[in-house]
Amino acid sequence: TMFLNPTDRVAVLDLIRGIIVLSGNDACAVIAEALSPDGTEAGFAKLMTKRGYQLGLTNSTFKNSNGWPADGHQMSVRDLGILAEKLFTDFPEYYPMFAEQTYEFDGRAPANSRNRNPLLGLGIGADGLKTGHTMDAGYGLVGSAQQDGRRIFFVLSGLTTLEDRAQEAETIVNWAFRQFVVEKFASGGSEIGKAKVWNGKSRDV
């Protein structure tokens, strides 16, 4: 939470940073009510579900803005991965916020100023994205990391402790960069071979 008061006037960028770094449920509600067609969080959830489907989130139904457990509120692991990549590609101006390790809004609650992503600062290229926890889903993490120009996205869910989440996430990142390499087979426009054509204008292409 950002520990917002009903009379606070907060810049949108501060609210976005509060959501990303501090997991600010109150900031989610403020933005949701501002964007909602009817000024309610429920109205925003309907809008978010519709927009999500347009983005390819076909297994997601939202009932609130912050992911708090609610009847009918659900999102698949696959959809989380799709959304993670969309955030990176469609909003490059905001993505660096996911790598911020601390944020103190207006000097409030310094004990709640640290990003909960356990991978940040480990020197493995991690720069996002978001942690989560519910009783049903356990501890989870939507993560991203980049090394030598190659980026990976991954989604973890169902871990039983904070420590398990941190260990599993670091293991996955190290494994992904160690086990896979990028190979360039050809450049655009270059000829890599010929294929025969039957009954065509040319004998091959």
Task: Locate predicted features.
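Active-site-adjacent loops and short helices of periplasmic peptidoglycan-processing enzymes
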Residues: 1-81, 88-91
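Domain-terminus/edge residues, biased toward the C-terminal soluble/receptor-binding domains
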Residues: 58-61, 69-205
